[in-house]
Amino acid sequence: MTPDPITIDPQTTLPEAGRLMKECNIRRLPVVENGRLVGIVTLGDIREASPSNATSLSIYELNYLISRLTIGEIMTRDPISITSDTSIEAAARLMLERKIGSLPVVDADKVVGIITESDIFRLLVTEGEIRPTFA
């Protein structure tokens, strides 16, 4: 788990969120409003919301439109979350069942961490037993 993750608010623009993800080398950002988790946005969400290269708009028109798009418009609302006392196994099962790559960790309505696929893999590789084959 990453404790005290970087969060953004719904009014953050698409370019701002993209820059933050790039600068911090992260792919997911919990979205917090008035101290409460209201959504999550991924790098995939940002890419999907970005215009295609095949557009007929000029670069100036594109930049204008993108600069006005907020995270609140593209985020996944009310994301599935866990508490800090949730077991790693339960978190991994939930991620697998729901086909999601991360879970915000929330205690007393406050985002205290985020667990990602990478955290699960890291734990498995460094502390768990890895079977030599899938058979």
Report the location of each language-model feature.
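Tandem CBS (Bateman) regulatory domains
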Residues: 1-4, 42-80, 87, 92-96, ...
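A glycine-centered beta-loop-beta connector
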Residues: 21, 29-45, 95, 103-119
